[in-house]
Regions:
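Hydrophobic/aromatic residues located in beta-strands of well-ordered beta-sheets
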Residues: 5, 37, 174, 224-225, ...
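Residue-level recognition of beta-strand->loop/alpha-helix junctions
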Residues: 41-43, 292, 418
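Radical SAM [4Fe-4S] cluster-binding motif and immediate context
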Residues: 250-415
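Active-site cores of enzymes that catalyze phosphoryl transfer or operate on phosphate-rich substrates
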Residues: 93-133, 144, 269-290, 294-297
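Conserved N-terminal ligand/cofactor-binding loop architecture of enzyme catalytic domains
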Residues: 38-127
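Glycine-rich beta-alpha loop elements in corrinoid/cobalamin-binding modules
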Residues: 3-4, 12-49, 102-242
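Short glycine-centered, acidic/aromatic-flanked micro-motifs in structured strand/loop junctions
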Residues: 9-12, 147-151, 324-327, 354, ...
C-alpha cells in the first residue's frame, strides 16, 4: 500500500486561522508510523482565488466603482493590516461589506454544490472546481484521502470532491471525519457509496489504526476505535465501533502546520490555534452539543506542555499571535499559563473563550493581560436569570457585569456571545 495519505479541508469556512484538527492528525500519524500525511487546504485556496479574481475584475460579482474600492481596501486590511485595521469604525464598515460579499458568493456556490449532489444538475463552474480539487488531491498518488469537516457548509463540497476523487482513482479509500461528521448520523454520510469510512470524535488513534489495517489488507475493521465502516452483512450496511479514550497529551506531538502557506489566511499576521484541553471543564450547559466532537470527559494538558507548544510554534514558525480553541479554560489554568509565559519571556498575544465566573478576580485578569491576553469571548448567553438557570450556566447577571468590568480594567477587550430567540 502506498504510504502517502492526504487530508483535505474543503470550502466553505472563512480562513482566518490555520486548520488544527488535520495538523494534529498529521503529526500523530507521522510520529507513530512511516505514513506521510499532507494537509491540503482547498478552503483557503478557494477564498484567495475568489478575492484575487474579484480584485482583478474577473468575478461574476458586479461592483460599482465605490464598492470595488471598498472591497480592495477590505482585502488589503485583512491581508496586510495597516492603520485601517486598527481604526474600529472603518474596520467594522469594511469587514461587514467584505463579509456580506463573501456570503453572497458562498451561497451561489453552495446552491450549485447542493444541486449537483442532490439532483445531478451541474453548473459548469461547480463541476470544473470539483474536478480541479480532486486532481490536486490525487497529484501525489495517495492511497487514502481524508476529508476534515468542521461545519455544515463544508459537507456538500466535500461530498462532490470526494465523488470525483473516487471517479479518477477508484482504488483510493475515502475517509470522512471532523466535528460536523461526528454529529451526522452514519446513514447520511454512507448514502454516498464512494465514502468508505467515517472517523468520529477524536480521530488520531482511530485514523492511524485504520491506515495500518488497510496496509495489512484487512477487510474487517471491528477492533478499531472511533470508526464507522461498511459491512454488507448487517442490516444497516455499516458498523459503528465503540469510541476510545482520547490520546494522552503526554504522547501527542505538537500539531504540524508545515503544509500550510501562512500568507493564505485573512489576518495581517497568522494566528495559530492552541488546544490545551479536550472537552469542557463545565460541561453542563443544556443547549451545547460541542461534546460530540470529543471522546470522554474533560482532559487538560499540564502547563509545561501548553507553554512548550507555544514556544515551539514561536521558534518554528516565527509567529506571535495565538487563539486558544478550548471549550473553556478555568481561571486557575489561565493564571498558571500566563505566569509561565511571563517567566519565560515569551512575547505573544492571544485570545480565548471563557465563562464569566466571579472567580475571574482582578488579579487573575491582570496577570492574564501581562501574559499576552488581549481578547476574551465570553459565553454570557442571556441576562435573564430564569433563562440562565434553565441553561445551567452557573452565572448571574450581576456577576457577569462585574467580571466584564474587571476584564476591561485589566485592558482586555470583551466579546459577548448572546443567544436570542
Amino acid at each position: 500500500m502506498n504510504r502517502q495519505v492526504n487530508i483535505a479541508i474543503c470550502p466553505f469556512s472563512f480562513p482566518a486561522s490555520l486548520p488544527l484538527g488535520p495538523s494534529i492528525i498529521k503529526a500523530f500519524v507521522e510520529e507513530h508510523s512511516d505514513f506521510k500525511v499532507a494537509c491540503v487546504d482547498l478552503n483557503a485556496e478557494w477564498y484567495n482565488t475568489f478575492v484575487d479574481a474579484a480584485l482583478a475584475g474577473k468575478s461574476f460579482i458586479q461592483f460599482t466603482p465605490q464598492a470595488h474600492a471598498d472591497f480592495t481596501k477590505a482585502a488589503a486590511m485583512f491581508r496586510q493590516g495597516g492603520d485601517v485595521f486598527w481604526n474600529e469604525a472603518e474596520y467594522l464598515r469594511l469587514s461587514r461589506f467584505f463579509e456580506s460579499t463573501i456570503r453572497k458568493v458562498e451561497n451561489v456556490f453552495l446552491d450549485g454544490f447542493e444541486r449537483a449532489c442532490a439532483h445531478g444538475e451541474y453548473v459548469p463552474p461547480i463541476k470544473a472546481y470539483a474536478e480541479h480539487a480532486a486532481r490536486k488531491l490525487l497529484a501525489n498518488d495517495p492511497s487514502v484521502v481524508g476529508f476534515s469537516l468542521m461545519f455544515r457548509e463544508q459537507y456538500m463540497p466535500s461530498v462532490l470532491i470526494a465523488y470525483y476523487v473516487k471517479a479518477l482513482k477508484p482504488d483510493v479509500k475515502i475517509v470522512f471525519g471532523g466535528g460536523y461528521t461526528s454529529a451526522c448520523h452514519p446513514s447520511v454520510v454512507f448514502a454516498n457509496p464512494f465514502i468508505d469510512f467515517v472517523v468520529f470524535n477524536e480521530g488520531e488513534g482511530g485514523f492511524l489504526d485504520l491506515l495500518q489495517a488497510l496496509d495489512r489488507g484487512q477487510t474487517r475493521f471491528d477492533g478499531i476505535p472511533n470508526l464507522i465502516w461498511r459491512d454488507a452483512d448487517v442490516p444497516d450496511g455499516w458498523v459503528k465501533n465503540p469510541k476510545s479514550p482520547s490520546v494522552d497529551f503526554k504522547t501527542q506531538p505538537y500539531p504540524d502546520f508545515s503544509d500550510y502557506t501562512l500568507g493564505s489566511y485573512f489576518q495581517p499576521e497568522p494566528v495559530f490555534p492552541i488546544m490545551s484541553s479536550k472537552g469542557c471543564a463545565w460541561d453542563k450547559c443544556t443547549f451545547c452539543t460541542h461534546h460530540r466532537s470529543y471522546s470522554g470527559a474533560h482532559r487538560a494538558a499540564n502547563t509545561d506542555r501548553v507553554v512548550g507548544e507555544i514556544e515551539h510554534m514561536v521558534n518554528t514558525y516565527g509567529v506571535k499571535r495565538f487563539a486558544f480553541v478550548d471549550e473553556m479554560i478555568s481561571p486557575g489554568r489561565f493564571r498558571r499559563i500566563s505566569e509561565d509565559l511571563i517567566a519565560k519571556g515569551i512575547d505573544i498575544t492571544w485570545y480565548a473563550l471563557a465563562k464569566p465566573d466571579l472567580i475571574y478576580t482582578q488579579d487573575v485578569l491582570d496577570i492574564m493581560y501581562k501574559g499576552g491576553c488581549r481578547y476574551l469571548l465570553w459565553g454570557v448567553e442571556s441576562a435573564n436569570q430564569r433563562t440562565i438557570d434553565l441553561m445551567d450556566k452557573g452565572t448571574t447577571p450581576d456577576g457577569v457585569a462585574e467580571v466584564l468590568a474587571r476584564s476591561t480594567k485589566a485592558g482586555i477587550r470583551n466579546h459577548l456571545f448572546i443567544i436570542v430567540g
